[in-house]
Structures are given as C-alpha cells and as structure tokens.
C-alpha cells in the first residue's frame, strides 16, 4: 500500500523526523525559510511503512510532517468528497 509523506513549510529544520524514521525515508535539504537553513524532504516515500514516528517526533506537533496512509491520503488532504 502506498503512503504519502507531506512536508509543510512550518518545518523548523530540527532533524527530529529524519532521526525517528526507521526506514530512512526522510532527509534534510537546504532551505532559507527557517533559522536552521534546512527543511525535511521525503525522496524515498516508497520505503515508508506508515509508522508515523516522524509525526510523533516533530516538535511542531506534527504540523510540519504528515504521513497519509493509502486511501486516507486523498480524504485527509481534502482531495475527495
């Protein structure tokens, strides 16, 4: 089942989500939108197992990173009615 990982611009660049991911889905990339000058990126979403550890680790109360599981994806992102 395919999962989607969405990184929002509320990311503070702390790397907590990257360190929490057991399958190395996330990585940090350069970004000038925060003090840390980096933002999380999800280049390997095909490896996501849907554990949502990245959400739990996020100090912004998972406002910066969200994992949408399979069919939950379109509903949660407001793409289905």
Swiss-Prot record:
EC code: 1.97.1.12
Localization of this protein: Plastid, Chloroplast thylakoid membrane
Reaction(s) this enzyme catalyzes, per UniProt: reduced [plastocyanin] + hnu + oxidized [2Fe-2S]-[ferredoxin] = oxidized [plastocyanin] + reduced [2Fe-2S]-[ferredoxin]
GO BP terms in the entry: photosynthetic electron transport in photosystem I
Residues binding [4Fe-4S] cluster 2: 21, 48, 51, 54
A GO cellular component entry from the record: photosystem I
Domain 4Fe-4S ferredoxin-type residues, every copy: 2-31, 39-68
Primary localisation category: plastid
Cofactor binding mode and count: Binds 2 [4Fe-4S] clusters. Cluster 2 is most probably the spectroscopically characterized electron acceptor FA and cluster 1 is most probably FB.
Pfam families: Fer4_21 (PF14697)
Broad EC category: oxidoreductase
UniProt keywords, alphabetically: 4Fe-4S, Chloroplast, Electron transport, Iron, Iron-sulfur, Membrane, Metal-binding, Oxidoreductase, Photosynthesis, Photosystem I, Plastid, Repeat, Thylakoid, Transport
Keyword 4Fe-4S assigned: yes
InterPro entries registered for this protein in UniProt: 4Fe4S_Fe-S-bd, 4Fe4S_Fe_S_CS, PSI_iron-sulfur_center, PSI_PsaC
GO molecular function: 4 iron, 4 sulfur cluster binding; electron transfer activity; metal ion binding; oxidoreductase activity
Cofactor: [4Fe-4S] cluster
Keyword Transport listed: yes
Residues annotated as binding [4Fe-4S] cluster 1: 11, 14, 17, 58
Function: Apoprotein for the two 4Fe-4S centers FA and FB of photosystem I (PSI); essential for photochemical activity. FB is the terminal electron acceptor of PSI, donating electrons to ferredoxin. The C-terminus interacts with PsaA/B/D and helps assemble the protein into the PSI complex. Required for binding of PsaD and PsaE to PSI. PSI is a plastocyanin-ferredoxin oxidoreductase, converting photonic excitation into a charge separation, which transfers an electron from the donor P700 chlorophyll pair to the spectroscopically characterized acceptors A0, A1, FX, FA and FB in turn.
HAMAP family: PSI_PsaC
Annotated PANTHER family: PHOTOSYSTEM I IRON-SULFUR CENTER (PTHR24960:SF79), PHOTOSYSTEM I IRON-SULFUR CENTER-RELATED (PTHR24960)
Subunit structure: The eukaryotic PSI reaction center is composed of at least 11 subunits.
Protein name, entry field: Photosystem I iron-sulfur center
């Amino acid at each position: 089942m395919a999962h989607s990982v969405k990184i929002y611009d509320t990311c503070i660049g702390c790397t907590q989500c990257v360190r929490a991911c057991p399958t190395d889905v996330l990585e940090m990339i350069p970004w000038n939108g925060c003090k840390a000058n980096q933002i999380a990126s999800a280049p390997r979403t095909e490896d996501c197992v849907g554990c949502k550890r990245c959400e739990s680790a996020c100090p912004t109360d998972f406002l910066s990173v969200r994992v949408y599981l399979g069919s939950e994806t379109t509903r949660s992102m407001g793409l289905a009615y």
